[in-house]
Amino acid sequence: MTQVAKKILVTCALPYANGSIHLGHMLEHIQADVWVRYQRMRGHEVNFICADDAHGTPIMLKAQQLGITPEQMIGEMSQEHQTDFAGFNISYDNYHSTHSEENRQLSELIYSRLKENGFIKNRTISQLYDPEKGMFLPDRFVKGTCPKCKSPDQYGDNCEVCGATYSPTELIEPKSVVSGATPVMRDSEHFFFDLPSFSEMLQAWTRSGALQEQVANKMQEWFESGLQQWDISRDAPYFGFEIPNAPGKYFYVWLDAPIGYMGSFKNLCDKRGDSVSFDEYWKKDSTAELYHFIGKDIVYFHSLFWPAMLEGSNFRKPSNLFVHGYVTVNGAKMSKSRGTFIKASTWLNHFDADSLRYYYTAKLSSRIDDIDLNLEDFVQRVNADIVNKVVNLASRNAGFINKRFDGVLASELADPQLYKTFTDAAEVIGEAWESREFGKAVREIMALADLANRYVDEQAPWVVAKQEGRDADLQAICSMGINLFRVLMTYLKPVLPKLTERAEAFLNTELTWDGIQQPLLGHKVNPFKALYNRIDMRQVEALVEASKEEVKAAAAPVTGPLADDPIQETITFDDFAKVDLRVALIENAEFVEGSDKLLRLTLDLGGEKRNVFSGIRSAYPDPQALIGRHTIMVANLAPRKMRFGISEGMVMAAGPGGKDIFLLSPDAGAKPGHQVK
């Protein structure tokens, strides 16, 4: 079915320029690249761009630690990032930096328009200031005791224990992360973006169907809580763009970071001249499509601040946000001590890019679900699907065609109906690629691969080859197998670019989406060479060991759980005494509808019942097994309102996460309500 060619601009979230690309990053870039490659196969004009997010206090401070300038550091990091993405065959049309002249000009333009339209407000605020470093402290550079639940060692913007959000000035006994000094309060004039003015527009955009349901639901929670004015300025010293006519004031990194999408595209337009127009994609009434692939941790900025900034400065809004979850490895968060915090470059020293591209693709859907890279399953799936089902289909037929028929395929299809079954699947598979239901697409393709191999098994060309006078049958059977291989590889082309190149060289033809409607008949293929090698667990073991060695080389030799969760700052006895730990009896435990992580626990404190939501479902798939157990809970934690209800405390557990979560229990004899001292 012929499609009308569309103009599409696709972006990935900008990697921060103070660290290496790891397998968590690669999920997003692979997901976007597969989608982009499919769009290009269908004849659409796609511009695929990215950039390094190169501003902010963390970059300034890390450069100081390294004894180099921020410009030098981000330049070196950009080269490393681009090398990693090229190694995974991410087909960017342009990769730029937010520290660019294009981004400076666009940031100043958007700011000036927002200011002219009355959306920038000035007011004096009190901030924490490090007297030793002579700098105001951003949220994440202050730690102290949570003002809500009194948990120690929490960052200045939100508590990782109770989930509360607050300003750094609300922290109890704050300390500078930079110097360890006790900050002092100091007044400073700041600039604020009037986000509440866009509430009605944003709610209409949310209801338009342009966003994933999970994103729209989360945005509704934010609307109900009320939008707040957004501080878009930071005080010197700061690495970034100085705000026009405001000496010593700089744009907050999250203002110019998304503008980096525009800056990278402007840079591409300037390189290409008249062949692509910036305004055609970014003007208010643009008919081009704009899609941002992002992780679920930055939805707030992309779904609220970014579209509001664009609306207020007379630019177009995104067509959609495509949000994905996190990556876990072997059921737990990536771990430096276990060697599962794997850098992209380390992966490529042990496996090819296509293997990870395939595994991620096979697990991805349009939902915001976390993806688990189970390394044993990875080996089994790559061997079973790519090697045994797809590549083997070509190898078991190519030998006969090359040796007996000089590489020339039969002039007719042996089974036209089977071939039609394969080509008819283009609509379903294409729709799955289009809607980002990648796992479904892979399942459909592998079902066809099973059909193809069943056909070859039933026709048994190795038997026919030994039978006198059946050369025509042999050529027809093997030609059919090779034609089915061609269709499979066409469907997999967005996922496996390097394998596709080798397949195209063997088939002596380019693989195109529409081309499969015409089978290869009387066509000469090239001599067959091995297309893909099997992988094994020894490679996995070497990969994990290499990742461990990198951690040892980069840091002090800390091993075990302490490498992933270092011991927090020393606290006083009085600090600890604020936390009221009690023995609790689990009276009931059940799944929480709508959540794949939470269990709802009913706890008896010896005269008082509590309802607690706990993220331990992955470790306790049978909640009934918890009923009757004693555990330890934080009894004086402030109640927390969640989408599923009110959580009235927190149970204590240990472990890295995933299936390795272990609920703490007291020794026999402890009673509900007993205090832990």
Swiss-Prot record:
Keyword Transcription part of the UniProt annotation: no
Catalytic activity: tRNA(Met) + L-methionine + ATP = L-methionyl-tRNA(Met) + AMP + diphosphate
Classification via CDD domains: Anticodon_Ia_Met (cd07957), MetRS_core (cd00814), tRNA_bind_EcMetRS_like (cd02800)
Names of required cofactors: Zn(2+)
Motif placement: 'KMSKS' region: 333-337
Record-linked InterPro entries: aa-tRNA-synth_I_CS, Anticodon_Met, Met-tRNA-synth_bsu_C, Met-tRNA_ligase_1, Met-tRNA_synth, Methionyl/Leucyl_tRNA_Synth, MetRS_core, MetRS_Zn
Cofactor info, note text: Binds 1 zinc ion per subunit.
Cell location: Cytoplasm
Similarity-based family: Belongs to the class-I aminoacyl-tRNA synthetase family. MetG type 1 subfamily.
A GO cellular-component term linked to this record: cytosol
Organism in which the protein naturally occurs: Escherichia coli (strain K12)
Name of the protein described by the UniProt record: Methionine--tRNA ligase
MF term (GO), any: ATP binding
UniProt xrefs under NCBIfam families: metG, metG_C_term, PRK00133.1
Role of this protein: Is required not only for elongation of protein synthesis but also for the initiation of all mRNA translation through initiator tRNA(fMet) aminoacylation.
Broad EC category: ligase
Binding sites annotated in the UniProt record for Zn(2+): C146, C149, C159, C162
Sorted UniProt keywords: Aminoacyl-tRNA synthetase, ATP-binding, Cytoplasm, Ligase, Metal-binding, Nucleotide-binding, Protein biosynthesis, RNA-binding, tRNA-binding, Zinc
Motif ('HIGH' region): 15-25
Location of the tRNA-binding domain: 575-677
